[in-house]
Amino acid sequence: ADGEGRLGDTVAAYRAAVAGADAILLTTPAYNGTMSAVAKNAIDVASRPRGAAPIVGKPVLVAAAVYSPGADERVLEHATTALRIAGAKPLERTFGITKHVEAFDEAGLVDKDRERELQALVADLLSPVPVS
């Protein structure tokens, strides 16, 4: 099923890393109005094998960096939906950055309020019971 007998070392190592993680921070750009294929594939690979998927029950903070205003909401919704279907436990709150080209400088996020917001979300993710 799903070609499980032909897994490479990279897939096995990735699944082991997901299994060993206390929590996951999934970040993605927007491509054609949704998450990147790499982010989607990361969710899909961690959702297998059925019955022993390493992503099941993992708390996940979803973050997206996009250019177009409003596009972050679509990307975050798509990623959160895929994670829930895969059995993960995405936080209710997500983090989106629009006009990402202008949002960062060499030191990080330009908007220090947004930086504090992200830090609080990561703290929630890493708390024993994630706050949604």
Predicted regions and their residues:
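Helix-loop-strand module that forms the ligand-binding subsite of alpha/beta enzymes
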Residues: 6-86
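N-terminal beta-loop-helix "entrance" segment that forms/cooperates
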Residues: 1-8, 103-107
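Flexible, glycine- and charge-enriched loops at secondary-structure boundaries
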Residues: 4-7, 11, 111, 115
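Glycine-rich phosphate/pyrophosphate-binding loop and the adjoining helix
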Residues: 89-132
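Generic, ordered loop/turn and secondary-structure boundary motif
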Residues: 1, 32, 36, 56, ...
